[in-house]
């Protein structure tokens, strides 16, 4: 039975990934005053299927000087970890209800760094290695602020379980009360998922395509799917953390629809940012984090720790 549950979670995620590629191309197309894909199927709806078919029937080429086992393991690991991170997300019921769901997600996103590092190293190409090293430095750096922001949110929620956040936000969204945290979280998720304007790892003008430059066909498709699954997962997590969806225990389906709509709007916002902003310079990217976000998030975290202790002696003012 558990396998059936697992499949009912994985298949919709992969379908969402397929159609996100189409939405991205359509949104970018309309923002550049053109149509986007509109040939395969009605309004280009079958384009993702055609893309998947094209990628998976291509011969998976492998550079002669590459490290074969690691070269193959990296994309598989990337997709596996991207799908594993969906397990504790409440929709409104998670696949496995963990006590330390947030910690589990942080650990999984840290492990995803290894797949990037291995792919860059195993390709035995200078471009891939430089792209991988950039991606690893960027991902590890921005995880620091993500963890501190999560800690601040959990201090407000009072539990490491994500399901508690539904109850916490019954009266008001955390996005309204903790908007600086929400803002920094959103920008950090952009950097964490290597999206524009932080897509330094795949700077086409410098690194061709970044750490996956030597990949073709199936393995490349796995990396691609992992990246987009991470984008949808991060936006769903943002929706859970900061814009708590309305949850009526008698109608759990309403919560799911609400959550999906919010995650979709956030994802379209990701694409809007991609269409609007130029790429950051690498040193600016690191300065933004270490000199702006980190001091701010640490100060806010200490504020959230100190306030309940400071206010504990004051009687209720109602």
Swiss-Prot record:
UniProt similarity note: Belongs to the complex I subunit 1 family.
GO biological process: aerobic respiration
Function description: Core subunit of the mitochondrial membrane respiratory chain NADH dehydrogenase (Complex I) that is believed to belong to the minimal assembly required for catalysis. Complex I functions in the transfer of electrons from NADH to the respiratory chain. The immediate electron acceptor for the enzyme is believed to be ubiquinone.
Protein name (record): NADH-ubiquinone oxidoreductase chain 1
Domain of life of the source: Eukaryota
Gene that produces this protein: MT-ND1
Family matches, as InterPro entries: NADH_UbQ_OxRdtase_su1/FPO (IPR001694), NADH_UbQ_OxRdtase_su1_CS (IPR018086)
TM segment ranges: 3-23, 70-90, 100-120, 146-166, 171-191, 222-242, 253-273, 294-314
Keywords in alphabetical order: Electron transport, Membrane, Mitochondrion, Mitochondrion inner membrane, NAD, Respiratory chain, Translocase, Transmembrane, Transmembrane helix, Transport, Ubiquinone
EC numbers, comma separated: 7.1.1.2
Subcellular location: Mitochondrion inner membrane
Cysteine pairings via disulfide bonds: none
CC annotations in GO: mitochondrial inner membrane
GO molecular function (one): NADH dehydrogenase (ubiquinone) activity
HAMAP family: NDH1_NuoH
């Amino acid at each position: 039975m558990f396998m059936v549950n697992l499949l009912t979670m994985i298949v919709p995620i992969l379908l969402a990934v397929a159609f996100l590629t189409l939405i991205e191309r359509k949104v970018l197309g309309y923002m550049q005053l053109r149509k986007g894909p509109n040939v395969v199927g009605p309004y280009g709806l079958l384009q993702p299927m055609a893309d998947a078919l094209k990628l998976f029937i291509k011969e998976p080429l492998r550079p002669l000087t590459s490290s074969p086992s690691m070269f193959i393991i990296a994309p598989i690991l990337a997709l596996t970890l991207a799908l594993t991170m969906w397990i504790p997300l409440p929709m409104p019921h998670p696949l496995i209800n963990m006590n330390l769901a947030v910690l589990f997600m942080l650990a999984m996103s840290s492990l995803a760094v290894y797949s990037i590092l291995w792919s860059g190293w195993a390709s035995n190409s200078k471009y891939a290695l430089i792209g991988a090293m950039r991606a690893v430095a960027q991902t590890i750096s921005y995880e620091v602020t993500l963890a501190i922001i999560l800690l601040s949110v959990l201090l407000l929620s009072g539990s490491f379980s994500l399901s508690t956040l539904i109850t916490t936000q019954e009266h008001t969204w955390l996005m309204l009360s903790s908007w600086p945290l929400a803002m920094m979280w959103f920008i950090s998720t952009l950097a964490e998922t290597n999206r524009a304007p932080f897509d330094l790892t795949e700077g086409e003008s410098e690194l061709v395509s970044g750490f996956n430059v030597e990949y073709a066909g199936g393995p490349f498709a796995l990396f691609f799917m992992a990246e987009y699954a991470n984008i949808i997962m991060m936006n769903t997590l943002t929706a859970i953390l900061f814009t708590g969806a309305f949850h009526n225990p008698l109608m759990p389906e309403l919560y799911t629809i609400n959550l999906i709509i919010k995650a979709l709007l956030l994802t379209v916002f990701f694409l809007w940012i991609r269409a609007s902003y130029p790429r950051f310079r690498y040193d600016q990217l690191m300065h933004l984090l270490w000199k702006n976000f980190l001091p701010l998030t640490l100060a806010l975290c200490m504020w959230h720790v100190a306030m309940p202790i400071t206010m504990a002696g004051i009687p209720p003012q109602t």
